[in-house]
């Protein structure tokens, strides 16, 4: 495992995030109270306009997140034993994001992350994440979420050509700590991976 590759990928992802389109940077910051954005209801518009607005608001939020990948589990029902034995399931890496909770307590984030993939090659990913959150009334500090991420990744075997990667998201959160996961669908001996990471908000 080459830690220099991970560091370089994280730096490049961070540079991309910091130099995203000026439309994101021009949106004024919104007020913050106890970790939640004080926002007016979302403006009317088509799906694309709402997506751009949500990305912009997350980008301008003062709240930050650290991402630590912890596991890539390959579905044993869709892989040969030989393949499983050859794959890496410890995706060492790190990521960074900016997030907000909207007026409905739903989570929005823009993020960049880099980790070691199944073949021990560096894989970067960056994108926008959204989750509808449920807050149990009698369990203070807990949140449960389900949603999606619209992301772009790049892999060694595809010569690091950027690839779109929309995926589902679910999470369990307690205060600032979250366990978040996605499932990457695929075919036999390809894809079908449960990817899990820890998210720490600061």
Curated annotation (Swiss-Prot):
The annotated site for Role in lipopolysaccharide recognition falls at 83
Site Role in the phospholipid gating: give positions.
188
Q: Which GO terms describe its molecular function?
A: O-palmitoyltransferase activity
Tell me the superkingdom of the source: Bacteria
Record localization: Cell outer membrane
The GO cellular component terms are:
cell outer membrane
**Which biological process terms from the Gene Ontology are attached to this UniProt entry?**
lipid A biosynthetic process
Q: What is its main location?
A: membrane
Catalysed reaction per UniProt? a lipid A + a 1,2-diacyl-sn-glycero-3-phosphocholine = a hepta-acyl lipid A + a 2-acyl-sn-glycero-3-phosphocholine; a lipid IVA + a 1,2-diacyl-sn-glycero-3-phosphocholine = a lipid IVB + a 2-acyl-sn-glycero-3-phosphocholine; a lipid IIA + a 1,2-diacyl-sn-glycero-3-phosphocholine = a lipid IIB + a 2-acyl-sn-glycero-3-phosphocholine
The active site lies at 74, 117-118
> InterPro entries from the entry?
LipidA_acyl_PagP (IPR009746), OMP/PagP_b-brl (IPR011250)
Q: Which residues form the signal peptide?
A: 1-25
Tell me the function of this protein: Transfers a fatty acid residue from the sn-1 position of a phospholipid to the N-linked hydroxyfatty acid chain on the proximal unit of lipid A or its precursors.
What family does this chain come from, according to its entry? Belongs to the lipid A palmitoyltransferase family.
What name does the UniProt record give this protein?
Answer: Lipid A acyltransferase PagP
Q: Which organism is it from?
A: Yersinia pseudotuberculosis serotype IB (strain PB1/+)
Q: Encoded by which gene?
A: pagP
């Amino acid at each position: 495992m080459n830690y220099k590759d991970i560091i370089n990928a994280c730096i490049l992802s961070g540079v991309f995030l910091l130099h995203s389109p000026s439309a994101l940077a021009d949106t004024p910051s919104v007020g913050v109270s106890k970790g939640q954005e004080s926002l007016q209801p979302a403006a009317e518009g088509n799906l694309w306009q709402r997506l751009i607005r949500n990305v912009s608001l997350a980008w301008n939020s003062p709240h930050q997140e650290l991402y630590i990948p912890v596991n890539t589990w390959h579905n044993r029902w869709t892989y040969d034993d030989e393949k499983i034995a050859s794959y890496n399931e410890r995706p060492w890496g790190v990521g960074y994001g900016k997030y907000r909770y909207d007026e409905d307590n739903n989570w929005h984030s823009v993020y960049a992350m880099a980790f070691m993939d199944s073949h021990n090659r560096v894989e970067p990913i960056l994108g926008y994440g959204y989750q509808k959150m449920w807050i149990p009334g009698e369990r203070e500090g807990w949140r449960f979420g389900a949603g999606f991420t619209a992301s772009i990744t790049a892999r060694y075997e595809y010569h690091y050509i950027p690839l779109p990667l929309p995926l589902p998201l679910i999470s369990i959160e307690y205060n600032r700590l979250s366990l978040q996961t996605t499932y990457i669908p695929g075919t036999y001996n390809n894809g079908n991976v449960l990817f899990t990471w820890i998210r720490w908000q600061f």
